[in-house]
Design a protein with these regions (language model features):
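… and, occasionally, acidic/histidine-rich disordered N-termini of signaling adaptors
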Residues: 1-167, 219-238
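C-terminal catalytic subdomain
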Residues: 86, 161-170, 175-238
Length: 238
């Protein structure tokens, strides 16, 4: 896709991973993307990660989660991110609660013709929007609770119209919850300021510099939690 540039980084902790992310085609005009962080570590967390990956891979597990079949052309309707999160909550909450787990998530749909990006967040770290024209960045805070607590869903979503050069970044809490030897959190504001400072770089380069900075901040190379970062740059809609 000539009008979109994706970048991602993943660094697993020393335990079995609970972070997953993906970018995929929904149809000729839409792309789906998500990032999920399953609580805890070990086999149970990995099991839920694999199960969620299968659920969100429509060719492997077509159950109407991402699309609803229709009798008339185009014979499907793409589910809004709010609906996808509500369906996952309905299917997984009781299973997760029984195992003492939960997961956080951001799910988004990008219209590759118009540049409209719709996002919904379930307890996950805030997605970061970086404007190319205004030279500013802000967190998209709309959303609802994590999945697995059995809480009522009151999810809010956000739709933004991307301009050429705009960036959106998703990251797991393994980044912002990194801790210095003095006990200070790296924090989401530090991430925002760092990526805004390097907004002229391709995201792949900016992510490498960010991870280098986090490692320097915490005084070690290893992370105590999984670290995953997923970002996109809207280049143009022509």
């Amino acid at each position: 896709m000539k009008n979109i540039e994706f970048a991602a980084r993943f660094i697993p902790s020393s335990f079995v991973s609970g972070d997953i992310y993906n970018v995929f085609r929904l149809d000729e005009n839409h792309i789906g993307l998500y990032q999920i962080d399953v609580s805890g570590h070990g086999v149970v967390a990995a099991f839920f990660s694999v199960s969620l990956y299968r659920q969100l891979t429509q060719d492997l597990y077509p159950k109407g989660l991402l699309k609803v079949p229709l009798s008339e052309p185009p014979h499907y309707e793409i589910n809004h991110p709010k609906k996808v999160i509500a369906l996952l909550d309905k299917e997984y909450s009781s299973m997760l609660a029984a195992q003492g787990h939960y997961f956080t998530m951001v799910y988004g749909i990008l219209n590759i013709k118009t540049g409209e990006l719709s996002l919904c967040r379930a307890g996950h770290t805030f997605p970061l929007f970086i404007s190319s024209t205004k030279g500013e960045a802000y967190y998209i805070k709309e959303g609802g609770p994590p999945i697995g607590f059995g809480l009522p869903r009151f999810d809010e979503s956000k739709t933004i119209k991307l301009a050429p050069g705009d960036k959106v970044v998703l990251f797991s809490d393994g980044v912002n919850e990194s801790v210095s030897p003095q006990g200070t959190l790296y924090g989401i504001e530090r991430i925002k300021e760092f990526l805004l400072k390097h907004h002229s770089l391709p995201l792949s380069e900016a992510f490498d510099l960010l991870l280098k900075d986090v490692k320097s901040f915490q005084g070690k190379e290893e992370f105590s939690d999984d670290v995953s970062i997923l970002g996109l740059t809207w280049l143009d809609n022509k």
